[in-house]
Amino acid sequence: DLRMSRGLGDVYKRQEKMMDKNAIKKFAVWARTELIARVSLKGVEYGITEDNIEDANADSVGGKVLTADEKKQRQALIAEINDKGYKQVMEEVAYTWFNRFSALRFMEVNGYLPSHVRVFTDEENSFKPQIITEAIHLDLDGLDVEKVYELKDAEKTEELYKYLLIVQCNALNKILPGMFQRLSDYTELLLPDNLLREGSVIQQMIELIPEDDWKDAVQIIGWLYQYYNSEKKDDVFAALKKNVKITKENIPAATQLFTPDWIVRYMVENSLGRLWLEGHPDVKSQLLPTEEEQSAYSTGNRDPEDTKWHYYLEETEQEPEVQVQLAEIRKEYAALTPDQLKVIDPCSGSGHILAYMFDVLMKIYESYGYTTREAVASIVENNLYGLDIDDRAAQLAYFAVMMKARQYDRRFFSRGIQPHVYAIAESNYVDKFAVDYFCNGDMKLTAAMDTIISELHDAKEYGSILTVTPQDWSALYDRFAEIKEDIHISRGAALRGLLPLVQTAETLAQKYDTVVTNPPYMGSAGMNSKLYDFVKEEYPDVKSDMSTVCMRKTISMCNEHGYMAMINIPVWMFISSYGKLRTEIITRNSLVQMLHLSLIH
């Protein structure tokens, strides 16, 4: 059922509640430059510039005597700069605060903050942070009320605000550890000054981006992220023209692209949605629109309560022998229950596809008779998986899934459930003592960890195209549970360094019923030598572009009768170098639908 479709995207564009993308882009591009400048200025205050760093053990800098905390934070910052370089650290601190500001704004607008106190605005959305006026009444973990009184009495409003902001971020670590990690000492040290002034990053975020754009639309986080990176992406490609290859650190900026909403809906509905409906045709009336509903949707008269699958395409009539084969496959689908489904976006970016997979899974669970609360918990625990090489993107994808869960279940944050959405971890700097402690002389654990460590070396270079050996995952997780309350000196290093490796390995090793993704696009000319050599060795038939490498890989991630849906460069259909890929797809797999985007205007 191959369709060369024209104008399908226009259907969605006519009815979509349009975000002000120009405002979002204007803010995000400006915010990156502004935040890097502001955190760098804080560095100067502590005797740290790109060209010079004053003594790490100094008790005072520029005539200012350092507190014990400031001295410790400054030493941590200097150590990080010595390890990663000045520019990289300033970039990381800037985007850390950008991510947090964006997440806090989304949560306050949607009423998701557990404190129910706005961080940036008052109830009328004016730039008068409610958290300041309610400071002495706040119920936040870690809040020093005496310090609050002290700062209020001294009328140090800016200092009070920075303190409350840090306490709020650290308090959210309890429910959103994947987004609000405990702030590194130096990250806190470099929080910009004058956040309450006219023209600050926070004030501009409130003024430039309409409040409605944040409401029930977690994809705004993805747009912010893409636009924030746009200048860096331009720099990477400008360097590429001068034959400077794309480094491991710059692969995310060079390859990530936010997927338009209608394309996400089309891919997810016709893969995950199709798999379910083919096994459970009796619920079609619950999940698919009537002709009248589809007509209204297409003309822009959309009911906000309408969550049916408007991009689902019914199959055309098949040949008799094909119908026999499909009947056998559909028996397998019919035996599936919602909690058995496993779906993944292996190049998840900021989580747009994962967020819509969540919506589609909710409809599936509801049609099967689950309560909303049961469905949300099961989706997060059993169904949904996401991976990305970029820590920032994975953080935002994690946040998107958690916000979806909170949207459906207002008490979700209290349930202690965390999603399977991870930044791909690499094993380059594993602590040998932590490995020895974790394995504890157990030969099976030792063999498993040795294999995982070997296979995930330089994993951030290769991402989800790595092939990982299945292990006894239960035994590994049982050991993590065992050491959780241990007091051994290596316990922390094992949990911090080894658990992410095991989570990454398991996610890469298992098979899925549906794989949906928008892969990275990078021609072989842009690959650095290490990545190119790996691709040439492991994926020789599709080595010309990372997107076709991902095409081959995602097919192998599917169960025997699973679905893969992805966007890709059209040349794989035509040029001779992709002949083997075409033959493999035709002989070993089945094409259900194809949408040629070049025909869409």
Each PLM stretch: what is its role?
Residues 13-283, 402-421, 426:
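Non-catalytic, mostly N-terminal accessory regions of nucleic-acid modification and defense proteins
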Residues 242-249, 253-593:
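SAM-dependent methyltransferase catalytic region
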Residues 10-12, 145, 303, 466:
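Polar low-complexity intrinsically disordered regions enriched in Ser/Thr and small residues
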Residues 7, 60, 140, 176, ...:
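Intrinsically disordered, low-complexity segments enriched in small/polar residues
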Residues 592-600:
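RNase H-like polynucleotidyl transferase catalytic core
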Residues 1-15:
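Single conserved hydrophobic/aromatic residue that forms the stacking wall/gate
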